[in-house]
Amino acid sequence: MASFIDLFAGDITTQLLKLLALVANTVYSCKGIAERLITMIRDVQPTIREIQYSGAELSNHHQTQLGVFYEILEKARKLCEKVLRCNRWNLKHVYHANKMKDLEKQISRFLNSQILLFVLAEVCHLRVNGDRIERNMDRLLTERNDSLSFPETMMEIETVSDPEIQTVLELGKKKVKEMMFKFTDTHLFGISGMSGSGKTTLAIELSKDDDVRGLFKNKVLFLTVSRSPNFENLESCIREFLYDGVHQRKLVILDDVWTRESLDRLMSKIRGSTTLVVSRSKLADPRTTYNVELLKKDEAMSLLCLCAFEQKSPPSPFNKYLVKQVVDECKGLPLSLKVLGASLKNKPERYWEGVVKRLLRGEAADETHESRVFAHMEESLENLDPKIRDCFLDMGAFPEDKKIPLDLLTSVWVERHDIDEETAFSFVLRLADKNLLTIVNNPRFGDVHIGYYDVFVTQHDVLRDLALHMSNRVDVNRRERLLMPKTEPVLPREWEKNKDEPFDAKIVSLHTGEMDEMNWFDMDLPKAEVLILNFSSDNYVLPPFIGKMSRLRVLVIINNGMSPARLHGFSIFANLAKLRSLWLKRVHVPELTSCTIPLKNLHKIHLIFCKVKNSFVQTSFDISKIFPSLSDLTIDHCDDLLELKSIFGITSLNSLSITNCPRILELPKNLSNVQSLERLRLYACPELISLPVEVCELPCLKYVDISQCVSLVSLPEKFGKLGSLEKIDMRECSLLGLPSSVAALVSLRHVICDEETSSMWEMVKKVVPELCIEVAKKCFTVDWLDD
């Protein structure tokens, strides 16, 4: 038998592919078979070439088997030549088509058996050699480390800490991979299971799995679809991923798919690739769907004990039977075990007894998984302070799968529940400790000066569903929270049916598309204090019934579309005398004039990704008369903001944040008018070239952030007059030096800067000994693209 390289020297696969392409284009009766053969041979061709050019010496057995494969391909080549020699309408085409079918079966059998055996054999061969090399390397490294006395080091790996839970995850991965490797011709696979069962965790682990990434040559895309998908964004991501110029098998993982319609729409964009759909429903063929298994009793016991006792089993004096009863009632659901375990942490046995009794009154185990989860979750909430519980329920007003700005969340709670910001912050920590929300990691979270800028929280879908479920138990007109669970083109029909009677809701949340005058119907909301308007469009007519919401204290208008929306109907603001907080995102801000209705109680304004145009340029009137009580102004990612002249006429300002505004060149000289200003953030304003000397006349200023102001090269000479200044953040600035007056900053306690600037501050530290100089690590992120 000739060697493998000799057999394939003529590259028979390339010749055969050309002939098959001609057959597919010219002989109708053989078209389908030829196309299938083309696919099969193209898939195996890279492997053949890899072996051919690797220089490896194959065993006699492997050469014999590959010789058989060569003979099959040679038969196929000769058959193609016969087919092409026949006239177009020759009856022999039928005979040739049957012959091609036989060859197709032979090739398929060979690829499904022999090739896999060869790979396994070579892997075993390499593994033996690799193990020997690894042992030799270990010995050499040990000898080297001993001679140099290297200190012991530790690497932290983000993984599941409990081996039993990790085993469950590995089992799920194994079963999904078995499906993928078995049904190679299938384009749709599924992971299905009840809420909180670990579907997403399993999907994420699969996306990182070496075997999966090897199968798809690292071409794996993970997308979260959600109940109200943004198809424009999702389809854009899919297009960029699939049409990257690389023609190979690819995997798209669609997580949190709610409906068949959503899947069908996205699948129409993923033709020719493999899709793994992750859903509460079974959307793929049962043969290619993995149903996530709930935890077994010992695994569930381990997870609950880790959350409640920080160990894998109950402590010896504790009543193990009580723990077992709680585990039994959780029915193996990981999310339920985790939340309930956290709620029971550090609680005495008597408290556990009460929880067990309440759990036993719940519904017995059955197919209705969501209701069981809600029942367990609600038991976990019973131990919360009533106001914290209400704050948890308020989170149902925000869209699913979206990061919630902490500043927005606390503003809602402050105005809704008459608490201060410090208390609202403690509520966030309390809910986070109970695993009822997640604080998105931010290294500066909790800093007393920074406040809540750039800090977000998220909430699991099941927990949000629980909040909606609990809020909707009473009649629609009696609900304290009137919430739309997902985006709809119009308001709910249930609301329209009951519009003749006033609604008692104090929080109203609407999720719609573009709305005009005809889309709204009248609603009487005399008790409403918070209104959240989420929409996606370029034009949006504000609901006329806002004008009757005389108690409204918080108004949030968020456009989730691609470009800023034009709002219509601003005349309704004339009746919002009690409005205290206004949050606008991705909209055109109306121009302020001397005729603008004053908002005398407005304390907070947030403008995010807005077009502000001339809103803050006018000097012909006193802007402080429109906002006489404004204490907190945030302008972020507003790329058309040019001047701030009128802003510094607002003498009541306590906090001013101008961030990511690329066209701001300078601050106005009337800056010193804002005598009560304590926090000044000018983060990432790359064209800002200087700070006016008037900034030194602010007696209450405690915090200054000029980080990423790359054009700023100096501080005012009299900067040392800021006797109340406690903290400066100046990372990624281009300062050439510090004024000598900074030695007089007796209250300064914290400076964040780059390595190059730190030496300047070391000189200041000699006269301000309590000064802490923090050298910042450079951090590049595009998280803001998610907003």
Curated annotation (Swiss-Prot):
Induction: Accumulates in leaves 1.5 hours postinfiltration of Pseudomonas syringae. One of its GO terms (biological process) is defense response to bacterium. ATP binds at residues 193-200. Residues 1-149 form the RPW8 domain. LRR repeats lie at residues 549-575, 576-599, 650-674, 722-745. Pfam families: NB-ARC (PF00931), RPW8 (PF05659). Disease resistance (R) protein that mediates resistance against Hyaloperonospora parasitica in a salicylic acid-dependent manner. Also mediates resistance against Erysiphe cichoracearum is both salicylic acid-dependent and partially NPR1-dependent. Resistance proteins guard the plant against pathogens that contain an appropriate avirulence protein via an indirect interaction with this avirulence protein. That triggers a defense system including the hypersensitive response, which restricts the pathogen growth. The LRR repeats probably act as specificity determinant of pathogen recognition. PANTHER family: DISEASE RESISTANCE PROTEIN ADR1, PLANT BROAD-SPECTRUM MILDEW RESISTANCE PROTEIN RPW8. This is Disease resistance protein ADR1. It comes from Arabidopsis thaliana (Mouse-ear cress). The lineage of its organism: Eukaryota, Viridiplantae, Streptophyta, Embryophyta, Tracheophyta.
